[in-house]
Amino acid sequence: MKKIEGIEELKEQFISQLKPLKIYLFGSFANGTYTEENDFDFYIIVSDEVKELKDLTTQAYRSIRKIKKRSVDIIIGTESTFENKKKSPSVENEVMKKGYCYMNQKAKSGLIWH
């Protein structure tokens, strides 16, 4: 995937503020069909221990408010929810099939930066 302006700053902010297990970019930026008008679509996977996903989503948007250079859509889900839904028709299935994993905390070699 070619380097996309502004995306590294967003990823770093998500990592420091949300402590995610995985961060996926999906939609037009992941499949290379984006234009200047398109937004970033992120699916962020967090631990099953996180119970207040709505609060975490609000925190995610607040954390990038001053650094984002285009519109951003964020979906936050737990690891078990993602695993349960990724094989059926769902956003999770789309993310799994066509998304780009930007960060994987659970990779065998440790933290992976893509």
What are the language-model segments listed below?
Residues 41-45:
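Short, aliphatic-rich beta-strand segments
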Residues 1-22, 30-36, 46-114:
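Catalytic core of pol beta-like nucleotidyltransferases
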